[in-house]
Amino acid sequence: MADAEVIILPKKHKKKKERKSLPEEDVAEIQHAEEFLIKPESKVAKLDTSQWPLLLKNFDKLNVRTTHYTPLACGSNPLKREIGDYIRTGFINLDKPSNPSSHEVVAWIRRILRVEKTGHSGTLDPKVTGCLIVCIERATRLVKSQQSAGKEYVGIVRLHNAIEGGTQLSRALETLTGALFQRPPLIAAVKRQLRVRTIYESKMIEYDPERRLGIFWVSCEAGTYIRTLCVHLGLLLGVGGQMQELRRVRSGVMSEKDHMVTMHDVLDAQWLYDNHKDESYLRRVVYPLEKLLTSHKRLVMKDSAVNAICYGAKIMLPGVLRYEDGIEVNQEIVVITTKGEAICMAIALMTTAVISTCDHGIVAKIKRVIMERDTYPRKWGLGPKASQKKLMIKQGLLDKHGKPTDSTPATWKQEYVDYSESAKKEVVAEVVKAPQVVAEAAKTAKRKRESESESDETPPAAPQLIKKEKKKSKKDKKAKAGLESGAEPGDGDSDTTKKKKKKKKAKEVELVSE
């Protein structure tokens, strides 16, 4: 029998089911309609997490510390807040018109929306147009962080004399990158001090040699004066130049492509809501403040820890559910709830590696609390000792502040440690110690100086000692003479006193006669 040839057929690879990415319109509808929440379970979400809204985007890629927590019904998804809260915790990406100042524009929006407080990130000069982020009420807490964010501009520079082609202008623009010295222009809203501002990138878009106009794009640090940059361009080219027109195309996270709205849009949206109760246009015009924080590293907290943070508690590791990769010490991060609401801005005190290895400790310190207090219920003071303390206050064994009284059991006094009092004592002790330490330091410094001066002094020569002895002997003689005269008062003393009186009288008479 001939050997039968065995033919091995190649295995069919099963194709992985690829999730079809939905069109943007459908995603927007789903985001506004459904409830989005990081649930205490490890099931895959229905909608791809890359299409989840705002700060919950790609939450499944965050490092998981624990999935166990008790969800609370309080709070809501930023996109599904009630219209009043939605506006009070929102911002507008406004296309600023030419001529009115930034402060005027912001005041008009405050009047249109009928809110108490508005603020803007990075002032634009009256003639400058473009991206102006207007923060409303609660969102004004983020103004500082947005003011210091990078900016992008498109400007037109007019040269005073002709140059050969646009290559010279593009070279000059490339030269004026990096850290530059700038003094604000003559007409400026700030003090005219020399300062350093960084230009990250710049490029020429177009140059018209007939009209001597150049269009350029600049990405720069906050507080850079483009007018001054245009003057410097003219000086560098040797022909002189000035800024003709300017538009801001990006401010921090928001650009002019991110649904920028005009003043008319805001006015129309408010009119529709007032007259037809249609809030859909207002929701398009105003964005939740969480959109400004999408570039920050995230830290997801348990619902039970949220209100404590709003009251200024330390961000401790047991309250953390998830954390992002690449967190560094002293980096600005955003602390969020499981529903994607921003609780506060914080400064990280642990890196991602330390968070993953530790089981206790302070993760970050609060920089700015964003969320309103008591949005979530209070969940502190529910431990065994705290519960016992509350019961004893009810029974009258402790006073209303939880301090021991005459009727307090001896066992409680011995066992219970009031950490708030111990902390106060430590602070008082430190305050008392501080002046003592300062006094001791001053004494030691004095001693050092004295010892140094003594060591620096040379031994005195013999003639100086002789002089000192002579002076002493003279003093002793005078003292003895004084004692003798004091012991035996004679007529001489009375004569001298009489003479003095006569002299005084004579002087007085002379003065009167003059």
Curated annotation (Swiss-Prot):
Q: Crosslink site(s) for Glycyl lysine isopeptide (Lys-Gly) (interchain with G-Cter in SUMO1)? A: 413
Keywords for the protein's UniProt record, in alphabetical order: Acetylation, Cataract, Cytoplasm, Deafness, Disease variant, Dyskeratosis congenita, Isomerase, Isopeptide bond, Nucleus, Phosphoprotein, Ribonucleoprotein, Ribosome biogenesis, RNA-binding, rRNA processing, Ubl conjugation
The record's listing under CDD domains reads: PseudoU_synth_hDyskerin, PUA_Cbf5
Short name of one Pfam family? TruB_C_2
Q: Quote the annotated effect of residue 121 to G.
A: In HHS; no effect on interaction with SHQ1
Q: Name one GO molecular function term.
A: pseudouridine synthase activity
Cross-link Glycyl lysine isopeptide (Lys-Gly) (interchain with G-Cter in SUMO2): which residues? 20, 39, 43, 191, 394, 413, 424, 433, 467
Changing residue 66 to A: what effect?
Answer: In DKCX; decreases interaction with SHQ1
InterPro entries cross-referenced by the UniProt entry: Dyskerin-like, PsdUridine_synth_cat_dom_sf, PsdUridine_synth_N, PUA, PUA-like_sf, PUA_sf, tRNA_PsdUridine_synth_B_fam, TruB_C
Catalytic residues as annotated in Swiss-Prot or TrEMBL = 125 (nucleophile)
Its EC number(s): 5.4.99.-
Q: Report residue spans for region: Disordered.
A: 443-514
Give residue numbers for the modification (Phosphothreonine). Answer: 458
Report the top EC class in one word. Answer: isomerase
- Which transformation does this protein catalyse, written as a reaction? uridine in 5S rRNA = pseudouridine in 5S rRNA
**Where is the PTM Phosphoserine found along the chain?**
21, 387, 451, 453, 455, 485, 494, 513
Q: Which residues form the PUA domain?
A: 296-371
Cite the effect that the entry attributes to residue 350 to I: In DKCX; increases interaction with SHQ1
Source taxon at top rank: Eukaryota
Instruction: Name the GO cellular-component terms.
Output: box H/ACA scaRNP complex; box H/ACA snoRNP complex; box H/ACA telomerase RNP complex; cytoplasm; fibrillar center; nucleolus; nucleoplasm; nucleus
Q: Which disease is it linked to?
A: Dyskeratosis congenita, X-linked: A rare, progressive bone marrow failure syndrome characterized by the triad of reticulated skin hyperpigmentation, nail dystrophy, and mucosal leukoplakia. Early mortality is often associated with bone marrow failure, infections, fatal pulmonary complications, or malignancy.
Q: Would you identify the family this protein belongs to, as annotated?
A: Belongs to the pseudouridine synthase TruB family.
Query: What name does the UniProt record give this protein?
Result: H/ACA ribonucleoprotein complex subunit DKC1
